Amino acid sequence: MIIASNNKGKLKEIKEIFNDIELKSLKEANINIEVDEDQDTFYGNALKKAKAIYELSKEETISDDSGICIDKLNDWPGVFTHRFLGEDKTDRERNLAIIEKCKDLKDRSARVVCNIVYYDGEKTVVGEGVIKGKITEEPRGENGFGFDEIFELKNGKTLAELNSEEKNEVSARYLALIDLKNKLN
């Protein structure tokens, strides 16, 4: 099965959950393609990627899309979390821009939403995970990637302040993977 990603952090998380299946990254499958994530839902982006990779490989594919939805900003940045500043920006630059956008908000409540799609050319199965928390006032933590350093859980820690085992128990991707795995079994 192919994971429609080369993101090392994402691959590690997925391989830890689906540890009983042989999984390949795009690089390991010798696939070099960028799929334009232009859909207006996480599900739409994940499905588009999964179908594109399947068409090239004819192998079962799992693909995900995720992002932060800030309640008081009408769920911004949502599906644009990784792209709202442009593809050439770092995680830190994006995170600082999100913090800046939230600076005047009294309520910084947010959700991380993750949709993971399995596609085999005929069957489409989606797993969804959602976690609630808030946007921090500054980045915190060294573990993780993406927006992990600015998303604070109800326990007061950011996702980046958790070790990988702790994060795997609470992350939206973990919840989506478990949901997907249960639906596939």
Language model segments and positions:
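Anionic-ligand binding patches
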Residues: 1-2, 9-185
